[in-house]
UniProtKB/Swiss-Prot annotation:
Pathway, per record: Carbohydrate metabolism; glyoxylate cycle; (S)-malate from isocitrate: step 2/2
A GO BP annotation: glyoxylate cycle
Protein name: Malate synthase, glyoxysomal
GO molecular function: malate synthase activity
EC number(s) per entry: 2.3.3.9
Organism whose genome encodes this protein: Raphanus sativus
Length: 566
């Protein structure tokens, strides 16, 4: 697949970088204020320290998949770090007062207008996302760093020329958390000692270096910065993050425990290691969050070779399913036992401005979901759109004057949850419509991701990001592999095959071209290339670990190697 890239000009300026660091992304004077010699040196030191530790746990995707599946299915869940499970220890008792109340959080990519609107939204927290909601192109990542620095400085503005409107921050804004990429994604535009930088350390390191001092003054009340950590599979990863935090605190000369982080529990292995993860991060933790969409993706990926564990249509895999409810309840109990917040994730429905009936349906779904969450004992929730914040805030108003439910909802009843509860096979039908929806979402999301957008409003009134696109991909792959019988609208069944899927792809491409081809400036040939890319992934003999990793090279735009110094 060929995508348009920037043209290199021989007389272009280059970044000033320290020994061992090469910056191969496009030069920009504004970016250069972020990519200073000192900031790049800081990132390089973090990577050199971390690389030594990560080498001990390095394993191929195939090896990891085999170990994870065996680990989960064996139910041999006794772990070596026994002190993390037993005893009455709690995470740091000096919890930052700035984040005692996090009942509603809004999430979104690190785009300039989004940052302003989210900070002004009335939510308690804004999670600025370098991960699933962002396509990690060089331009997006560097503009995101610039935007966050301006936000922390309080100087961020945005001029919407079409509306002739200037956006700026209110006096009262949400607390800022930043989510870096997962460990699996590299940053190919920066080389450290000849190897691609680790994406999450670039995101974390540049943001921390430029903002820790100002953030602690204006946002953190002496603490911070604050982070969300995604895609963890094992407490070893939490231990590595803890060492990164301690190294950063030491280099900055701030107190140990200043940095605080919430971990997303969004993989099947991690749900069995929540105590261990909190224990490793006990001086830096402020809670765990149910990353429900990635969790479903992880369930399918973990059991990819087990035809007895096929999921129904993804729209049917909600928190009402026993294995999902068990996961959420156990997370609440674990967090409250250890003195930190528990969240359940996204209300992905978005406001529908031009369809009052559809809008009412979406808002009703959100209201019911949020009331269920607060009654279960969660301390807060996520919203994908500012229009949903009043509904979420009203639901969590049931907590009364208390900023959280850590002491009032211990959920000791969840101690009875077993491994079988967490692995119970979900119920529901598998349909041809489900296969079609997965295919449409996959093609359209991939098109958006490769052209710079990471979060896209698509079908079912939802905001799709990488997590839901990944569910669609792996579910189609599994259904094809095992020739699953799918129900048609007529009630008859049809067996999935590569040939059937090929016909579905062609039909859904035609539908997409009619619906959004011209509107979103997606050329017909571009759509067809993307569809072929997805079709190849879904029908491959082996399942790719992450679709975004498999297609990452298509958004990399390298410039000549001699860009390391002025």
């Amino acid at each position: 697949m060929e995508l348009e890239t920037s043209v290199y000009r021989p007389n272009a300026a280059v970044y000033d970088s320290p020994d061992g660091v090469e910056v191969r992304g496009r030069y920009d004077q504004v970016f250069a204020k972020i990519l200073t010699r000192e900031a790049l040196g800081f990132v390089a030191e973090l990577q050199r320290d971390v690389s030594l530790g990560m080498l001990r746990y390095a394993w191929s995707a195939v090896e990891r998949q085999n170990v994870v599946t065996t680990f989960v299915l064996s139910l041999g869940l006794t772990l070596p770090l026994s002190s993390s499970e037993i005893g009455e220890w709690v995470c740091s008792v000096c919890s930052p007062p700035a984040v005692a109340d996090r009942r509603v959080e809004i999430t979104g990519p690190v785009e300039r207008k989004m940052i302003i609107n989210a900070l002004n939204s009335g939510a308690k927290v804004f999670m600025a996302d370098f991960e699933d909601a962002l396509s990690p192109s060089w331009e997006n990542l560097m503009k995101g760093q610039v935007n966050l620095k301006d936000a922390v400085d309080g100087t961020i503005t945005f001029h919407d020329k079409a509306r002739n409107k200037v956006y700026k921050l209110n006096d009262q804004v949400a607390k800022l958390f930043v989510r870096p990429r997962g460990w699996h994604l590299p940053e190919a535009h920066i080389l450290i000692d000849g190897e691609p930088a680790i994406g999450c350390l670039v995101d974390f390191g540049l943001y921390f270096f430029h903002n820790y001092s100002k953030f602690r003054q204006t946002q953190g009340s002496g603490y911070g910065p604050f982070f969300y950590l995604p895609k963890m599979e094992h407490s070893r990863e939490a231990k590595i993050w803890n060492s990164v935090f301690e190294r950063a605190e030491k280099m900055a000369g701030i107190e140990r425990g200043s940095i605080r982080a919430t971990v997303l529990i969004e993989t099947l292995p991690a749900v069995f290691q929540m105590n261990e993860i909190l224990y490793e991060l006990r001086d830096h933790s402020v809670g765990l969050n149910c990353g429900r969409w990635d969790y479903i993706f992880s369930y399918v990926k973990t059991f990819q070779a087990h035809p007895d564990r096929l999921l129904p249509d993804r729209v049917l895999v909600g928190m009402g399913q026993h294995f999902m409810r068990s996961y959420s309840d156990l997370l609440i109990r674990t967090c409250h036992k250890r003195g930190v917040h528990a969240w359940e994730g996204m209300a992905a429905q978005i406001a529908i401005r031009d369809d009052p009936k559809a809008n009412d349906m979406a808002l009703d779904l959100v209201k019911k979901d949020k009331l269920r969450q607060v009654r279960a004992g969660h301390d807060g929730t996520w919203a994908a759109h500012p229009g949903l914040i009043p509904i979420c805030m009203d639901a969590f108003g049931h907590m009364g004057k208390n900023p959280n439910q850590i002491k009032s909802m211990k959920r000791d009843d969840a101690s009875a949850i077993t491994e079988e509860d967490l692995l119970q096979i979900p119920r529901g039908v598998r349909t041809l419509d489900g296969l079609r929806l997965n295919t449409r979402v996959g093609i359209q999301y991939l098109a958006a991701w490769l052209t710079g957008s990471g979060s896209v409003p698509l079908y079912n009134l939802t905001d799709e990001d990488a997590a839901t696109a990944e569910i669609s991909r792996v579910q189609n792959w599994q259904w094809i592999r095992y020739g699953v019988e799918l129900k048609r609208r007529t009630g008859l069944e049809v067996r999935v095959s590569k040939e059937l899927f090929g016909r579905v792809v062609e039909e859904e491409m035609e539908r997409i071209e009619k619906e959004v081809g011209k509107e979103r400036s997606l050329r017909e040939e571009c759509i067809r290339k993307l569809a072929r890319c997805l079709q190849s992934s879904v029908t491959a003999a082996e399942l790719d670990d992450f679709l975004t990793l498999a297609v990452y090279d298509h958004i990399v735009a390298h410039y000549p190697i001699n860009v390391s110094r002025l």
